[in-house]
Amino acid sequence: MHRPALLLRRVKVPDEVVRILNELHAGRRPILIVTAHLGNWELFAQWLVLRGYPVAAIVRRMSNPLIDQDVNAVRERLGGTVFREHEVSRIGAWLRAGGIVYLLMDQHIAAGSVRVDFLGRPAFTTPFVTMMHKRFGARVLPVVCVRHGTGWAVETSGEFIPEYTGDLRGDLQRNTERLNGILGAFIRRYPDQWLWLHNRWKDK
């Protein structure tokens, strides 16, 4: 995390991923990059920052304040921006300015969540991505950064396009479940690389 040149060499980002990313970001359009605690999720965010993309990560406060401080200090030292999950106005301003927001969606969320399928079981999940797409026109790109041999490779399912029917609650549920399905497919492909230590499917 402290040697940018080595990091750039070890992360393989296919030309197709770069092409999609640049097309979505053309004209400084905002992007939501959606991922999971799979492989090395921090690495691609750092790659983006080192390549000059305006990236901000949405993070939850860790239970250990010293680790929380150290991890976020590294993120910011490399040039990234960090938002706490409750800083909605700052996140919105970042998107309005054409920034990229990087978030992990495979975690239990109680407040404001929708209960949709995740890996075959109902799970409370944030509908944040669909809400930000609808409000700011942010493009959505699901990605993972997974281990291959001694390095890491970035994969994407391509741009995710939310669908709207006029039923806001139903749209939030359907689009969130679709995103869960995409992340779930990546997790099923690389189950040994999924890091999850708490009850993802607990009751609200």
Describe each model-derived feature in a short phrase.
Residues 7-10, 35-36, 53-56, 93-96:
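Short acidic/polar alpha-helix capping motifs at helix-coil junctions
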Residues 1-35, 69-73, 77-79:
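Membrane-anchoring hydrophobic helices of lipid-metabolizing enzymes
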Residues 29-86, 108-118, 147:
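Catalytic core of membrane glycerolipid acyltransferases/transacylases, capturing the structured
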Residues 19-27, 50, 54, 86-204:
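Non-catalytic C-terminal accessory region of glycerolipid acyltransferases
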Residues 6-12, 60, 77-83, 118-120, ...:
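Short, flexible loop segments at the rims of nucleotide/cofactor-binding pockets, characterized by
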Residues 16, 41-45, 61-63, 101-103, ...:
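Short hydrophobic/aromatic-rich motifs at helix boundaries and adjacent loops
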